[in-house]
């Protein structure tokens, strides 16, 4: 669930031809990010191999590449492209519906 290298990140977002993936950009010092963690964990169980996390402190290059300025920031990728960005903490149903929508 945690993305630890740029190579891993690129592999995941570019291997989405038949599926969308949700990436949570977060940091351990961010209170709202910690509040979102149980939701992301639950989503990863509902959508195996479709939900990932990027620690922006550890993966600054990825965060800069996608213009992450505020966290939590959740992006839905498909075919290597950002389909949608959700800022802040949302209900689990919002993330679930977006992931289902872009997976079709």
In which residue ranges do the predicted regions lie?
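Thiol-based oxidoreductase modules, predominantly thioredoxin-like and allied folds used
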Residues: 3-5, 25, 37-61, 68
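A short beta-strand-turn-helix
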Residues: 2-20
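Short pre-active-site segment immediately N-terminal to redox-active cysteine/selenocysteine motifs
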Residues: 19, 25-29, 70
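Structural micro-motif
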Residues: 66-75
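Structural signal for short hydrophobic segments within the conserved structured cores
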Residues: 1, 52, 83-86
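The canonical Cys-X-X-Cys-His
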Residues: 30-33, 74
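Non-catalytic, surface beta->alpha helical segment in thiol-disulfide oxidoreductase systems
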Residues: 76-104
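CheY-like receiver
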Residues: 11-12, 62, 98
């Amino acid at each position: 669930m945690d993305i630890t290298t740029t190579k891993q990140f690129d592999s995941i977002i570019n291997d989405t031809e038949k599926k969308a993936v949700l990436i949570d950009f977060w940091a351990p010092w961010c209170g709202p990010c910690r509040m979102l963690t149980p939701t992301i964990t639950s989503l990863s169980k509902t959508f195996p191999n479709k939900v990932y996390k990027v620690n922006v402190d550890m993966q600054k290059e990825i965060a800069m590449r996608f213009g992450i300025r505020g966290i939590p920031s959740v992006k839905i990728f498909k075919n290597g492209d950002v389909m949608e960005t959700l800022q802040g903490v949302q209900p689990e149903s919002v993330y679930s519906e977006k992931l289902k929508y872009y997976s079709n």
